């Protein structure tokens, strides 16, 4: 509880300082809105949840109107994109006074604040992970952290302008001197930021001193603000050994600080210093994460050497715990910031919980051995800082490229080294506080002079940091675990690069440029709309391509060329015209061809069947003019006239061909005559004659005469030839009906009987005996077909006169009157019936 009370008092004092800074346009509140755009530009800074964020929630409670006014004032004051305050987010996240005061407070808690810087980067990534896992709690923390970063960003911008001239080391010892009692003094003197913020400011200032002492490139990368980077670069030379040990300690703290509860407690205990340190770390981490290739170790040390970073940029809160209360606050701050940093996927392989971070921070409290060496080297580094700043300003652009190439692997490696160093830093933290406080006081005096130069340089680095932030974050996530063992080597290379190159501070300035788009639109704003314009330009080009006019017509050839071409092609044109004229007479041919196509069936037999003589295709008929010599001569004359007409139409121009290559006249005037090799001859191939046919009379043979005589005799006998013919036909039909049973003799007998009946009226009994009974039945059936009346009369006569004589039969027949045509048939039938009946009677009678 005692630790929480000083934190509350620090928060009240930070609020009072913020109110004082509002008229000076450097209050923490306006700085927060500026840091917000920076967070938007760099994904890491936007989402980083730090102790500062938890402590910054008090200023967030203030009305938004005041915050907006302060933001506008800060933007007005910050004409240049105040990039240096980004690295100072942890150290001097608020106005220059607040930055120095916070740095002094951070010296009290220097050790915890240093890990917080690396954790700021990790916190950014971890806050994103915590937002997904923990829900609104992590989101509220991230928003509070963003606002705290925003408040710190403008302050860093102002402080960065102030700090570059003199390193923040003097302000850091002030924070160290503050300890628990001095922290209260800083609360009154610090900016209106919550006590955690001044502690974080002290932590970033200490981080600035220590990375300079360590001379590792990690520290320059961490101070995303120019001022913080300059302080870090100066302090890296002094804190080379301490930075490596503290980086290892920070890793240990982050591994232990994976739990969420101790982090919140640390934030409540040391909110001002840790939040400021974490904000600086957040800004530095996005820059380092964005610039992993440009400054590999800086980003990792921003995570894992936050003690050095905060000592160099501002008093390191983790290494400064002189008193028990300050040590606890600093350790909590370090655990919160450092644990948050490693919780992020970029710094730690697993999603670190806040509890593990608190444990690591508690371990960092005792780690002060490395800070003793840092205090010894800080005094020397402070002198070198000014020289390094000058060199860095000259070589910012070139060094940024080099740092962008290195950082990804070194960041994770440095974290492990920092954790190891932090283990022994707590013992010597008391000495470091006094030295860092003195250094911070010196820095507080000088910062106003150095501010104008640093903000100009960082915008260049802003572009680099923005380009590299996303890559660094991804690289940190992938490479955070394996490269940890290489801590000592990489920090040394980074320190050398950081001392020579102020590229790291410029990168944080790049992040600020997006946040302060109005003040520095050149580096980022014009480029982005330029890219949008480029995107819109292809659309316009597409529309223009669609609406392109037709290609321009080719220019007319010169008169000489045209004449020469005409000379070459005129004969072809004349010949083509002649062909057209000759084919004009053949225009009806298509009709004939159509006929031939219609008669496709006939065409199929071409070459297969023998054509009739004289048949040919009408299309193949020769021209009559070709056959006659006179006609061919006339055609030639017509062709010549046509050629003359064509040449007359052509403009008369002298055609100049190749000189010295004229053809002889015999060749030039040669006339080509084409004669057909076929000769046509006409003649009669076949003819037709039509004649009347002559009917030849047939010769009558002897047999025919005999037949005719028989017929004549029959006619005379019957009195009518037709009757005999009818009788013969009837007899033949009867024979057919009787079938094979009737013999020829029977038929003859019947015929003879009929003839006898016609002639004599006598009927032979022998004939009746020969007729079978079946024949009689059939004749009866045939009689039914004949007239019924006649049959009845015949039947009556036959029944009454069965056994009459021939004479009686003849008399009765004469009485009957029958048609000549029907008589013979009926007579025959009657006779047959009578004969059949007589036959039956004869059969019945006994012999």
From Swiss-Prot:
**Intracellular or extracellular location(s):** Cytoplasm, Cytoskeleton, Actin patch
Q: Where is the composition biased (Acidic residues)?
A: 370-386, 417-429, 632-643, 757-772, 807-820
Q: Where is this region: Disordered?
A: 1-665, 716-775, 793-821
What segments bear the compositional bias annotation Polar residues? 89-98, 130-146, 186-224, 280-291, 309-323, 564-575
Q: Where is the composition biased (Basic residues)?
A: 653-664
Is DNA repair found in the keyword set? no
Provide GO CC annotations from the record: actin cortical patch
Principal location: cytoplasm
Provide this UniProt record's keywords sorted from A to Z: Cytoplasm, Cytoskeleton
What ranges does the record list as Low complexity composition bias? 464-481, 747-756
Regions of biased composition (Basic and acidic residues) lie at 10-20, 54-78, 225-258
Family to which the UniProt record says this protein belongs: Belongs to the AIM21 family.
Function of the molecule: Involved in mitochondrial migration along actin filaments.
What protein name applies here? Altered inheritance of mitochondria protein 21
Q: Which organism is it from?
A: Candida dubliniensis (strain CD36 / ATCC MYA-646 / CBS 7987 / NCPF 3949 / NRRL Y-17841)
